[in-house]
Amino acid sequence: MTTAAEIQHLQQHGLYSSGNEHDACGLGFVAHIKGVKRHDIVTQALKILENIDHRGAVGADPLMGDGAGILIQIPDALYREEMAKQGVTLPAAGEYGVGMIFLPKEHASRLACEQEMERAIKAEGQVLLGWRDVPVNVDMPMSPTVRKKEPILRQVFIGRGNDVIVQDALERKLYVIRKTASANIQALKLKHSKEYYVPSMSSRTVVYKGLLLADQVGVYYKDLSDERCISAIGLVHQRFSTNTFPEWPLAHPYRYVAHNGEINTVKGNYNWMKAREGVMASPVLAADLQKLYPISFADQSDTATFDNCLELLTMAGYPISQ
């Protein structure tokens, strides 16, 4: 029963509570219950994203938000036909991975990043199949501030090596490739190396995201409106940044999660994970574990850090439900 004091408080302050200003992000998920891949799953997920635009932040510039994106399954037919135009025949679905990569606009830095990625692929015994420029709508209205930060968007296609038999092993190799390439690129201390980022690298899923408004994601990324873009799942997120500034890499979804909330123990969690790096061991990752450090970075958002840790545990063999 509502007390007299509570009624008086409501009369004076209304239903608004400043305590709720900590987890305003919007997220949604749609899936075919039988796992059937269809294009309308993608369009329905994008519609959900449009319908939760009120959960994301918009600046004084109405074309600048905190970021939005979608995670879907690999659209094999789309990628297969597009890569065939370059003379590249992709292996069977599940036998190759796709890395979605944000690259610097500055040519020399971009070339250095691509070369380090190719070196990492070769070093891990996997096969570089080719690169693809991600088609985007350059005519879409975009905030000048967002346009200034807009990366070059490319996909790298990676075939499994002879030592990789099952898809889980390929996922682990892609994980190691992504981590080692990123570490090597940052070690170069390029002027624009901070503009390099890998939203996803997997044989199962791909992430399309950016410093976009909710209704811009499906317009900006032309792949998403292509009828060949089919998936049985669609995970979408519209960001309301609370503890980090809006940036292209910090948009959700991440590789494993999309999150509505704020993890206030993020610094402690990061430090604990950093401390554990010296004593961790994994029979699944074996010697590759040493190539993955650091697991996370101090200048990321709370969700990015959580995603890094969840990814490590999953790659080490823990069920995601555990």
Model features per residue range: what roles?
Residues 1-322:
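Conserved short alpha-helical segments that host acidic/polar catalytic motifs at enzyme active sites
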